[in-house]
Amino acid sequence: MLLPEEPAILEVRHAVRHWIAAHAPDGDVAVALSGGADSLALTAAAAVEARSAVALVVDHRLQRGSADVADGAAARARTLGCASAEVLPVDVTGSGGLEAAARQARYEALDAGRGTRPVLLGHTLDDQAETVLLGLSRGSGGRSIWGMSPYDSPWGRPLLGVRRAVTRQACTELGLDPHEDPHNSSPDFVRVRLRTEVLPLLEDVLGGGVAGALARTGEHLREEGAVLDAVAADAEAKVVVDGEIDAALLALSAPPVRRRVLRSWLLAAGARGLGDTQLRAVDDLVARWRGQGQVAVGGGTPDARLVVRRRRGRLNVGLDDRRRV
């Protein structure tokens, strides 16, 4: 399909072309298509910029008529020039609330359906700003406000520099009528309230440019964090011996490096839901040792929790009977 050379669609195409050149030089991609403006504009651009683009449409089956919406989105993808379009029905179950469960089901379906292709997601600069703001509100360290990466294999995000208004305008230029998901305007979801209440207020009070500033902040922190991660990886190779950490040797490292080493080590040992409070408590075993007891870090088994202990100058991870808590 030939696309009109209008400003918005050209901006989207440029972003997709740049992403493919950087991350998918063979030109084969999958696109996650919901039928909304962001993913529609992305699909239209990918269909002409990629060597081969396939559309994956996840039907969460949470609303009446969702199958018709999914089928319509798939048909539109074929019209736009995608090599194929597949509807992936999912069951949304699990803990953490509807948003989290739907996200998990969606990503699992996309991963199963993509084959060997990277999956392009329609996250925009506005989504990036919301993500950074959410991370900031949690106060769990610099990593939480990095925002989303342009490529976190297999997930690609070509539109992180494109405003949501541009994708909507691109759909208008293409004569496409995006599907409006009721969940995207429901105040029951924190991200929706950020989008419709908090960010507009910040833009008004601070005189505009807030979304772009938040996105740039996340990008800068992500770049700086990558350097610290590399330093921490070198340090980890030196201080971890037979699965245990030499506390005195790690204590010589700067605090951000120490915590990165500990985070990597704990995750490799099976820690789950690791938060800033837990990480700092483990860091205290290294840098502020005064004979304190073990630190629970999340994870383990139904009968035993995962804990970190310091013994004879080394940190080790073990299990502790939950019934003794």
From Swiss-Prot:
Catalytic activity: cytidine(34) in tRNA(Ile2) + L-lysine + ATP = lysidine(34) in tRNA(Ile2) + AMP + diphosphate + H(+)
Chief location bin: cytoplasm
Name of the protein in question: tRNA(Ile)-lysidine synthase
A GO biological-process term: tRNA modification
UniProt similarity note: Belongs to the tRNA(Ile)-lysidine synthase family.
This enzyme's EC code(s): 6.3.4.19
Signal peptide: none
Entry function: Ligates lysine onto the cytidine present at position 34 of the AUA codon-specific tRNA(Ile) that contains the anticodon CAU, in an ATP-dependent manner. Cytidine is converted to lysidine, thus changing the amino acid specificity of the tRNA from methionine to isoleucine.
